[in-house]
Amino acid sequence: MEQISVVTTVVDSRSVADVLAAAAVAGRLAACAQVGGQVDSTYWWRSAVETSSEWSVLFKTAPDRVNALVDQIRATHPYEVPEILVSRAESGNPDYAAWVHEQTRP
């Protein structure tokens, strides 16, 4: 099976999440992007504990497209220090993995 990478981030509005998802797929940096429902995050920021509502975005991509995808997310993300996490799927449907690779070719 070809490898798949999953890139995740969170943003402060559904509309921003939708824009990030659409741009990544349109640019063939991700085969699929899923915008998750609202979650509440609690974190340290500037010496204080903050809580805010955020929307998650999960991108499925080929490993050789990860750096370009991360660069695009960083360039358009509204946060000063955006959460961008990359993980690799260890196993899964080989047909889906092949589809991800096919859809992320420039």
What positions do the PLM features span?
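Positively charged, small/polar-rich N-terminal and surface patches that mediate targeting and assembly
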Residues: M1-P106
